[in-house]
């Protein structure tokens, strides 16, 4: 492996980390407030689909990214309404979003573009990239880093973040201090899903330039693993997300080399996810009220 190959893998890993980091950061904020969602895989897929539609209609990738955020917000409001205000189970709505994506995206691609399973976006609907000898970089890489750092700073260094963490650790005490637990939990859920929506739209209108019925590729679940690996810390999620992106980039580099069987190469990012998660089981410390509905008495 030459120095150029190493740089190619590193550049690819920066692109691959974006949807994982954005989703991990959003999930960490939401769970710090006490709301669990396992529906980020579906959010990524649905927002990738609708982001592509918005981008094509407007002829602008930026509009597509905004469209993905809007889709994430709507799905987050749905999840928040069911879990925060209706006191429903936190897992079931996420499963519903994942199942919805498996139906709506393949059908939508066929109905809207008339193609089976995949559609290539025109050039004017995709984001420009900075070209280098070792690969291309999107401005979304920098945006993702800024979002992770700012989210960490707000969560751990500001009164707003203190209140968010309070409703996830001890909502009864927070309520007694006059903090509106339901409001903070609801909007934290919306923020988490909005970031996942941005990550989904990034995949279609920026990174890959296409829509595919399975393009999320398990990244929503990998992002949740990264969130746990990072200890619900958005800043560490940035490092963990790059690590997962590195293994995905390494798999992409190895695939045409035929050094090891292709099936194993495709499994590599998921094998590393299992190894990392297995290594932290029993040591992870989620917020005390994570996933528990709060009912004011």
Identify the role of each PLM range.
Residues 90, 101-157, 257-265, 291-297:
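Transmembrane helix-bundle core of multi-pass membrane transporters
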Residues 8-57, 65, 70, 74-91, ...:
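Single transmembrane alpha-helix segments in multi-pass membrane proteins
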Residues 29-47, 84-97, 163, 187, ...:
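Short, non-helical or kinked segments that cap or interrupt transmembrane helices
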Residues 81, 85-110, 121, 144, ...:
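Pore- or pathway-lining transmembrane helices of multi-pass membrane proteins that form conduits
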Residues 8-10, 155, 192-225, 256-261:
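Inter-helical junctions in multi-pass inner-membrane proteins, predominant
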Residues 151, 169-183, 254-297:
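Cytosolic-side transmembrane-helix boundaries in multi-pass membrane proteins
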């Amino acid at each position: 492996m030459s120095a150029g190959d190493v740089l190619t893998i590193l550049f690819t890993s920066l692109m691959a980390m974006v949807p994982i980091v954005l989703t991990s950061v959003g999930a960490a904020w939401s769970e710090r407030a006490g709301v669990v969602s396992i529906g980020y895989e579906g959010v990524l897929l649905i927002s990738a689909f609708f982001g592509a539609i918005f981008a094509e209609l407007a002829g602008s990738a930026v509009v597509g990214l905004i469209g993905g955020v809007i889709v994430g917000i709507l799905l987050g409001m749905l999840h928040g309404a069911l879990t925060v205000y209706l006191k429903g189970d936190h897992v079931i709505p996420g499963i519903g979003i994942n199942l919805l994506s498996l139906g709506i995206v393949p059908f939508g691609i066929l109905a809207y573009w008339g193609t089976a399973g995949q559609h290539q976006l025109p050039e004017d609907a995709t984001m420009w990239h900075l070209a280098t000898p070792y690969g291309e970089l999107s401005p979304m890489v920098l945006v993702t880093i800024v979002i992770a750092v700012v989210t960490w700073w707000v969560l751990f260094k500001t009164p707003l973040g203190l209140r968010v963490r309070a409703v996830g650790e001890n909502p009864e005490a927070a309520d007694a201090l006059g903090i509106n637990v339901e409001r903070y939990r609801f909007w934290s859920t919306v923020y988490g899903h909005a970031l996942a929506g941005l990550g989904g739209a990034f995949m279609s209108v920026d990174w890959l330039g296409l829509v595919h019925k399975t393009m999320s590729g398990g990244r929503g679940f990998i992002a949740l693993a990264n969130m746990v690996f990072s200890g619900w810390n958005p800043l560490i999620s940035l490092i963990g997300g790059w690590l997962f992106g590195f293994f995905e980039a390494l798999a992409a580099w190895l695939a045409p080399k035929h050094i090891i069987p292709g099936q194993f190469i495709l499994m590599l990012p998921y094998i590393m996810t299992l190894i990392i998660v297995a290594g932290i089981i029993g040591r992870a410390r989620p917020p005390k009220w994570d996933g528990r509905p709060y009912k004011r008495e």
